[in-house]
Amino acid sequence: MSDIIREAVTQLQSKIGTFDGSVKFVIEDEGSIILDEEGAREGDGDADCTMSADAETFRGILSGDVNATAAFMSGKLAVDGDMGTAMKLGAALS
């Protein structure tokens, strides 16, 4: 597991814990994370929603320095799947 993935899993666990639904985060050139009712973990399974971004954007979203909606609107964050799940996660991260 890369340091970026490890750090992101730790931050998601402390910030959100568990999540009603499933989201996969794909961090370019690093790997992917699943967040669901079991918590956050490294993984590459099916999810209701998939969010893809580079490591810098993902770190900024987790730290609160980057607004997820603004990242999506500017093309730095790609979302595929259930937009309702993505919006629910965005609210949980803010």
List where the protein language model places each region:
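Feature captures hydrophobic
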Residues: M1-S94
